[in-house]
């Protein structure tokens, strides 16, 4: 039987420690101490440190995907759905610096670990395809100029990742506004003239 409270406590402790110390510098023992569980409890839920890290990554990216879907669902049309996602930047920037550091830690760990890189690549491909589909639909409906949907989606995803990284290296209140204005600039460049 899975005790969700215990499992969530372990996940929260790991997320905090990974964002503070990094993947390599965080031990399973430290995670267990912070979560106030035994190593046996840890291994009951997660067979390895890597599988634990991947579950944190998966939960984080599923939450992000859910929020993106919510913005798209509540928009009036394809172009507005993309534009409305600028509000997501505001939410992301309010989530705090530890989330940004955790994101960078996922990227860093992915460089050295093939399984983590594979999981990151799957999500980046998912997001790219998702945005490409929205853009293709916008082109078909005459809302967006005839651009290459896949290339445009890559630009949007790359911009989002770059903006998150900039917030880590230059944390100030301006990044939220710069992010929204930047995505608007990208979207205005593909909007079909009336």
Tell me the role of every PLM-derived stretch.
Residues 1-5, 194:
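N-terminal intrinsically disordered/low-complexity leader segments
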Residues 9, 13, 17-51, 55:
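Helix-turn-helix
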Residues 55, 69-97, 152-156, 176-180:
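Hydrophobic alpha-helical connector segments
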Residues 58-63:
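Short, basic, alpha-helical segments at the C-terminal edge of helix-turn-helix-like DNA-binding modules
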Residues 85-91, 129-137, 159, 165, ...:
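C-terminal peripheral helix-coil segments that are non-catalytic and often amphipathic
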Residues 93-117, 168-169:
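Amphipathic alpha-helical segments used for helix-helix packing
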Residues 95-98, 114-140, 150-154:
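Amphipathic alpha-helical packing segments from all-alpha helical-bundle domains
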């Amino acid at each position: 039987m899975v005790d969700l409270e215990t499992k969530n406590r372990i996940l929260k402790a790991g997320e905090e420690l990974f964002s503070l110390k990094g993947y390599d510098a965080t031990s399973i023992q430290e995670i267990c101490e912070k979560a106030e569980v035994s190593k046996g409890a840890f291994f009951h839920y997660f067979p390895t440190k890597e599988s634990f890290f991947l579950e944190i990554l998966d939960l984080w990216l599923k939450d992000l995907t859910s929020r993106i879907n919510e913005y798209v669902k509540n928009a009036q049309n394809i172009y507005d759905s993309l534009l409305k996602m600028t509000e997501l930047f505001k939410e992301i920037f309010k989530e705090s610096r530890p989330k940004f550091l955790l994101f960078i830690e996922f990227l860093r760990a992915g460089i050295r670990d093939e399984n983590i890189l594979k999981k990151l690549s799957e999500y980046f491909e998912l997001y790219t395809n998702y945005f490409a589909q929205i853009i293709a639909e916008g082109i078909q409906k005459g809302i967006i100029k005839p651009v290459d949907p896949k290339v445009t989606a890559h630009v949007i995803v790359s911009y989002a990742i770059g903006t998150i990284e900039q917030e880590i290296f230059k944390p100030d209140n301006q990044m939220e506004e710069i992010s929204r204005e930047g995505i608007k600039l990208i979207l205005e460049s593909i909007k079909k003239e009336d």
